[in-house]
Regions:
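Conserved donor NDP-sugar-binding/catalytic core segment of glycosyltransferases
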Residues: 7, 11-42
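Alpha-helical elements of Rossmann-like donor-binding domains used by nucleotide-donor carbohydrate transfer enzymes
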Residues: 7, 11-18, 89-93, 127-130, ...
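Conserved beta-strand edge residues that scaffold enzyme active sites
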Residues: 34, 108-109, 146
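Membrane-proximal basic amphipathic "stem/tether" segments
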Residues: 135-171
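Conserved nucleotide-sugar donor-binding catalytic segment
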Residues: 44-127, 131
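Short beta-strand-to-loop acidic/aromatic patch adjacent to the donor-nucleotide binding site
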Residues: 1-7
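Conserved residues at the C-terminal ends of beta-strands
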Residues: 2, 31, 114
Length: 171
């Protein structure tokens, strides 16, 4: 599920080939290097492993997620009515269908920060809410989670504007 400005690490193909020989899964996922616009390393991102939370959170790192063709054939392709959450929706659909996920504790890709999902958080929240409702979640629960995420996002943005944050980021 790699995007145009993301990149596979040179050893990723070999790692995946070996993992496929060891473990028969439908979806393989791993860690990722997050890089800035100049391709400088910002941090290593590891997925959260509670796949049941996929309905509300992207717990996997989509550029470091690899899906076998058979899983697409059995579960379908991306739902293009989603602009921001199509990868999360597809992975949730595969999870609900009982597809087997396998975690590889290695960095498999470089992910460029600052993409569309990062810069359109309100639209992402709205689309995520639509997705949750389409899977039968209650309106009250969906709206509550949307409010919590919005407040959390606003707090993070406020922290990023402080002098202390800028000093610590420069270290």
């Amino acid at each position: 599920m790699i995007n145009a400005d993301d990149e596979l690490l040179p050893e990723t193909s070999e790692i995946l080939k070996n993992e496929c020989k060891k473990i028969d899964a439908d979806i393989y996922y791993g860690n990722c290097y997050w890089v800035d616009s100049e391709r400088n390393l910002e941090y290593v991102s590891k997925p959260k492993h509670d796949l049941s939370k996929l309905l509300y959170n992207m717990v996997l790192i989509h550029p470091s997620t690899f899906v076998k063709k058979k899983a697409y054939e059995e579960c379908g392709l991306f739902d293009v009515t989603y602009k921001y959450c199509m990868d999360k929706e597809l992975l949730y659909r595969m999870y609900k269908a009982g597809k087997k996920f396998d975690y590889i504790d290695r960095c498999l890709t470089k992910f460029k920060a600052g993409g569309v999902s990062d810069t359109h958080s309100k639209a992402v929240f709205k689309e995520g809410s639509r997705m949750a409702l389409s899977y039968g979640e209650s309106q009250i629960k969906v709206k509550s989670i949307e409010i919590i995420k919005t407040v959390r996002n606003q707090m993070v943005n406020m922290i990023k504007e402080t002098r202390v944050y800028r000093v610590l980021k420069g270290i």
